[in-house]
Each structure stands twice: as structure tokens, then as C-alpha cells.
């Protein structure tokens, strides 16, 4: 055998696959794989419910519809005598109203009682004619006609009544941001005079995203 044949035979011997089989996986490896799968499933579950810029949390409990965000405004009613009424039109910031053709899907009102609250109030939101002066007589008639849902909020010893919010769905009406000035929050103080330091109303307006919505709403 010449030198070239010897070299070739050596190479062939080196290319032979190594005999034998891998050792069986240890129980630690199996446990690690199971744990990894569980963590992966958990992460997917958490990610599905996690708010994002495009799908923020609506009032901390329900996610906005895809492609929507929301703008919040706070109303603090003045003193309302027993059996009297208060109304305030929805006035959004200029940075939002300049996109007046963006659709509005829902309005949510949350009642936040302050420590001195000890009354019963009725709260609703209504579309109000531009000519309306939101007088006591006009607001009283709107509460009486049953044309929109009414939240009855009563004093609770715990400080917060379990049902402290309601949704007003505008999807079928094709309302837009420009229409919001036609809507008003109405309050009726039923059993007692409502003082200025007893109640705060948070109004959350869910609307199509606008270019200025670069961060999650607070």
C-alpha cells in the first residue's frame, strides 16, 4: 500500500460515526422541560391580558376595543340641594376635539364618593339639544323619560358601593368626538343636599385612536 492509499484509509476511519447511543435523559432534564412549558403557557396568558399602546385598559377593568383608546375627564358637582339637579356638558381637551370625526364607542361614568358622602344620587348621561340651558326643569324631564340608563348610588358603610359605574353604548349611533359637546352628565340629589366635598365623577370616553395618543392613558 502506498502512502496515498494509507492516508485515504486513515481519513475513512476518522469519518466513521461513533458507535454507541446517548445516555437517557435525566429526571432533572424532564422536570426542566415541564417547567419551561408551564412558564411559556403562563407568559402567553399574561400577555393576552396585558394592555398595550394599541389596546389599553379601559378603566382598569376592561380593555378598549382594538383601535380605540379613551380620554378621561373629572367632574366635581357643586352643592346640589335636596331634590334638585345638576348638569354639565362633556368638554374634551382641545388636543382631542381637533380630531372631531373620530368615532366614539362608549361612555363610562364612575362615581367616586369622598369620605363625607352620606347621600343618595342618581347619575346619567344624555344627548342634550344645543338650545337646552340644563335647567332644573329640563334635567328633571330627562330623568323621568327613561331614555337612558340611570345609576343610583347610595351611601355604603364600607365607603364604596359595589356598583359604582355604568356604560353608555354609542356604537349604534355612530357618534363622534365632535358630538360629545351635545352630551351632558346629569345628577339628581334625592334624599339630602349634596355638598361640594362629597362626590367626584370620572367620565371615560372611549374613542378611535388619535395621533396624539402616544402613551397609555392614566
From Swiss-Prot:
Its Gene Ontology cellular component terms are: ribonucleoprotein complex; T=3 icosahedral viral capsid; viral nucleocapsid
User: Region entry Disordered: which residue ranges?
Assistant: 1-28
**A Pfam family matched by this chain, by name?**
Cucumo_coat
Q: Where in the cell is it found?
A: Virion
Q: Is Acetylation included in the keywords of this UniProt record?
A: yes
> Is Ribonucleoprotein one of the keywords?
yes
Q: Name one GO molecular function term.
A: RNA binding
InterPro entries, per database record: Cucumovirus_coat (IPR000247), Cucumovirus_coat_Asu_sf (IPR037137)
Q: Modified residue N-acetylmethionine is at which positions?
A: 1
Keywords from UniProt, A to Z, are: Acetylation, Capsid protein, Ribonucleoprotein, RNA-binding, T=3 icosahedral capsid protein, Viral nucleoprotein, Virion
Q: Which Gene3D superfamilies match?
A: Cucumovirus coat protein, subunit A
| Compositionally biased intervals (Basic residues) | 11-21
Q: Which family does it belong to?
A: Belongs to the cucumovirus capsid protein family.
Its UniProt domain note says: The N-terminal arginine-rich stretch does not seem to be the major RNA-binding region that allows formation of an infectious ribonucleoprotein complex.
Function, as annotated, reads: Capsid protein. Probably binds RNA and plays a role in packaging.
What is the name listed in the Swiss-Prot or TrEMBL entry for this protein? Capsid protein
Amino acid at each position: 500500500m502506498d502512502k496515498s492509499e494509507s492516508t485515504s484509509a486513515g481519513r475513512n476511519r476518522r469519518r466513521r460515526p461513533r458507535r454507541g447511543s446517548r445516555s437517557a435523559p435525566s429526571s432533572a432534564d424532564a422536570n426542566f422541560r415541564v417547567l419551561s412549558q408551564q412558564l411559556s403557557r403562563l407568559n402567553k396568558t399574561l400577555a393576552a391580558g396585558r394592555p398595550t399602546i394599541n389596546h389599553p385598559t379601559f378603566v382598569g377593568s376592561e380593555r378598549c376595543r382594538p383601535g380605540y383608546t379613551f380620554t378621561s375627564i373629572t367632574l366635581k358637582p357643586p352643592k346640589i340641594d335636596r331634590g334638585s339637579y345638576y348638569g354639565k356638558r362633556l368638554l374634551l381637551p382641545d388636543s382631542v376635539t381637533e380630531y372631531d370625526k373620530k368615532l366614539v364607542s362608549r361612555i363610562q361614568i364612575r362615581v367616586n364618593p369622598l369620605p363625607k358622602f352620606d347621600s343618595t344620587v342618581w347619575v346619567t348621561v344624555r344627548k342634550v339639544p344645543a338650545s337646552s340651558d340644563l335647567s332644573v326643569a329640563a334635567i328633571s324631564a330627562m330623568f323621568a323619560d327613561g331614555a337612558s340608563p340611570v345609576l343610583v348610588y347610595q351611601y355604603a358603610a364600607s365607603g364604596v358601593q359595589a356598583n359604582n359605574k355604568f356604560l353608555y353604548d354609542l356604537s349604534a349611533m355612530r357618534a363622534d368626538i365632535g358630538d360629545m359637546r351635545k352630551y351632558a352628565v346629569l345628577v339628581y340629589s334625592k334624599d339630602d343636599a349634596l355638598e361640594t366635598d362629597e362626590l367626584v365623577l370620572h367620565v371615560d370616553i372611549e374613542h378611535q385612536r388619535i395621533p396624539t395618543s402616544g402613551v397609555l392613558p392614566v
